[in-house]
Amino acid sequence: MLRVAVPNKGTLSEPATEILAEAGYRRRTDSKDLTVIDPVNQVEFFFLRPKDIAIYVGSGELDFGITGRDLVGDSDAPVRERLALGFGSSSFRYAGPAGRDWKIADLAGKRIATAYPNLVRKDLAERGIEATVIRLDGAVEISVQLGVADAIADVVGSGRTLSLHNLVAFGEPLCDSEAVLIESDRGGQDDTQAARDQLVARIQGVVFGQQYLMLDYDCPRAVLDKATAITPGLESPTIAPLADADWVAIRALVPRRGVNEIMDELAAIGAKAILASDIRFCRF
């Protein structure tokens, strides 16, 4: 039986649970449940703190886990990323008091508060910067105001929380994070390989369905080459003749992001009846 870790709370918890449910796995009925067994698919789910998941997976006790890329990087656990899941996006960045033109080099000799000390130490070492890293488990932004730190390194979404504490982000992100499916570097047992491959394929199919649309349209045969260049699909678009020999019907998968621009381009070359449809799953 596969053993899979899922975030028990926080912004990653609900989307992770939804993806697994869409992939055909049993969901927990009570938010207080710490384990759920899916006897049909031979999977046991463990609901754990997102920050601990990489450690459990890296130990080899669990086969897979869903957590943030930033948390994986900070854990130093022996795991590998199998899939990016397309939710929980954020940037991990340095920030300091507003009103100063901060540069990364300015961190030399400073005190940096963070909930991700390993990630920060690795970044500073790569840059050849010596600084004091102070570990805090929450409310990192207030540390500068309280005089505990000179700067911080933290997850940044909209930047609103930084602004509330008169802080400004600077430098390139240490890590662009999102939810990821991770697997132990220790490998799995041979008798679970089929189940492991199935779980990855199912989740990948759900994620793909969230990121792509099916586009159908009628196209003048005279501009067929231009149209297929705009919508090449994954392998190749489907092209079917219409009753009017001068026209063809085209179907292709296109990225959800940017679909309106694609439809604009098709309309500009004379395509008609352009229809975008949601897809739920896709297997490669």
Curated annotation (Swiss-Prot):
Q: Which SUPFAM superfamilies does this entry report, sorted A to Z? A: GlnB-like, Periplasmic binding protein-like II
Question: What keywords is this UniProt entry annotated with?
Answer: Amino-acid biosynthesis, ATP-binding, Cytoplasm, Glycosyltransferase, Histidine biosynthesis, Magnesium, Metal-binding, Nucleotide-binding, Transferase
Listed CDD domains: PBP2_HisGL1
Q: Does the keyword Aminoacyl-tRNA synthetase apply?
A: no
Subcellular localization(s) per the UniProt record: Cytoplasm
Q: What broad class describes the main subcellular location of this protein?
A: cytoplasm
**Entry keyword Nucleotide-binding:** yes
Q: Where is the signal peptide?
A: none
Q: Superkingdom, according to UniProt?
A: Bacteria
GO terms in the biological process aspect are: L-histidine biosynthetic process
Q: How does it assemble?
A: Equilibrium between an active dimeric form, an inactive hexameric form and higher aggregates. Interconversion between the various forms is largely reversible and is influenced by the natural substrates and inhibitors of the enzyme.
Query: What family does this chain come from, according to its entry?
Result: Belongs to the ATP phosphoribosyltransferase family. Long subfamily.
Tell me the PANTHER family matching this sequence: ATP PHOSPHORIBOSYLTRANSFERASE (PTHR21403:SF8), ATP PHOSPHORIBOSYLTRANSFERASE ATP-PRTASE (PTHR21403)
Q: Which NCBIfam families match?
A: hisG, HisG_C-term
User: What is this protein's name?
Assistant: ATP phosphoribosyltransferase
Question: Taxonomically, what lineage is the organism?
Answer: Bacteria, Bacillati, Actinomycetota, Actinomycetes, Mycobacteriales
